[in-house]
Amino acid sequence: MEKVDTTWRIFITYMLLLVFVLFCGNAFGQIKVIQFNAGWNKANEAPWVVKLEDCQTIGYIDIATDKEAQKEYKIAVIPTIVIFKDGDEVARFQADLSFKMVATREEVQEEINDQLMSDF
């Protein structure tokens, strides 16, 4: 009997599985986070936004220099953190009257987790 080399078959199977997992992760339930602030309010920025897990942090938009973004996203107070799922806004966290972010990293992360779990 001839021995069949199954190494390549296993490799191809794992590669197809990896491609499928990556595709599903990118195609469904994509969470993005944007922090809006202004240069003059840097002291009240939420630096922990970049440490949020299971989401893509788009970054920081300075509404003092990007008035179009302020208008488009209806930013009334800064800092503001907006969470998007599949391109739609699903949550917003805003500062208090002293321009300080009230929400904690844990609260924002919990919202991200809730949004991810809502797909199941």
Residues of each region from the PLM?
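Bacterial N-terminal signal peptides that target proteins for export
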Residues: E2-M15
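Bacterial N-terminal signal peptides
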Residues: T13-N26
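Local sequence-structure signature of Cys/Sec-based thiol-disulfide redox active-site neighborhoods
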Residues: A27-G59
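Extracytoplasmic/secreted cell-surface and envelope-processing proteins
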Residues: K42-N44, A69, A91-F93
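N-terminal post-signal-peptidase region of extra-cytosolic proteins
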Residues: I63-Q70
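Structural micro-motif
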Residues: Y73-F84
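Non-catalytic, surface beta->alpha helical segment in thiol-disulfide oxidoreductase systems
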Residues: I83-F120
